[in-house]
Amino acid sequence: MKKSLNEIAQYLGGTVSGDGEVLIGGLATLDDAGEGTLTFLANPKYAAKVATTKASAVLMGTGGNTHGKNAIFHPNPYLAFAKLLTLFYTAPAKPVGVLPGAFVADGVKLGADVSVYPGAYIGAGAVIGDRVVLHPGVVLYPGVVVGNDVTLHANVSVRERCRIGNRVTIHDGTVIGSDGFGYAPDGASYYKIPQIGIVIVEDDVEIGSNCVIDRAALEATRIRRGTKIDNLVQIAHNVVIGEDCIIVSQVGISGSTQLGNHVTLGGQVGVAGHIKIGDNVMIGAKSGVAGNVEPNQVLSGIPVMPHRDWLRSAGIAPKLPEMKKTLSALEKRVAELEAKLAKGE
């Protein structure tokens, strides 16, 4: 499928610079693009590559330097390029129905146009919405509820009674609803606290591969609408993640913590239990959050502090050995002077 630059600009709501009739048959990066492809520039760091790219056209921010190349100007080129990917590339066709080798227990309700691949297991009483895709190895325990237009990739497990909203994608190997880590000490050992709650994943959530979201002890661990979770994330029991949050890889969130809306946690952030993080908070990678965080802050470090303070601290750290030598020399000099004063010299 080929489209003219004018057609693409109209689809995106952008403005053409150069030859609007040039035909585009694919998308590529600045480095790998060739004739007939469209590339994009979203990060000014790579602006110099526009001059050398072999793409037939460049999608870029309004008023950018085209270096004489055909271009589409758009106020948000990154978002525009994402929309183009859905225009130029479609997912492989999927079979419809329950394929041989899948197991569907008694009492399951299947919606219209579902795709259940070989090796998938659906437990008794589960409710599956329309246009749901269950890839090989997916396990839905009894009583699970899955909304419409959901894709569960290979080897995803959703434990008993947990609920998945509409337009949710969960990637390979993730577990939804495993037991929370709850034990009561009895003086000699630990007594397991039964975890009888559930996990609720709301609409338009995407969860990466090999994540674990534990079920609540009594009520619900909840992932609210629009949140995106990267690979290898651990979310403990009773946690509530707000709307449109970004949780990057290897984050760990301890039990009963609550995140507000539009919170971003960078890679490997550790969050203590039973705390609250307000709306619109950004926390830098490898940070440790031990207490409540007020809204509208950018924090980093262990423990977290305002990001600018952390940058100053990080800048000082490499100088500490030399500063210690200087301080030791000054201490020695002060001691010598005090000794002389004591002798009346």
From Swiss-Prot:
Residues the record marks as active site: H237 (proton acceptor)
Biological-process GO terms, alphabetical: lipid A biosynthetic process
Primary enzyme class: transferase
CDD domains: LbH_LpxD
GO cellular component: membrane
GO molecular function, one term: N-acyltransferase activity
Recorded family membership: Belongs to the transferase hexapeptide repeat family. LpxD subfamily.
Protein name according to UniProt: UDP-3-O-acylglucosamine N-acyltransferase
Organism the protein comes from: Citrifermentans bemidjiense (strain ATCC BAA-1014 / DSM 16622 / JCM 12645 / Bem)
Higher taxonomy: Bacteria, Pseudomonadati, Thermodesulfobacteriota, Desulfuromonadia, Geobacterales
Gene: lpxD
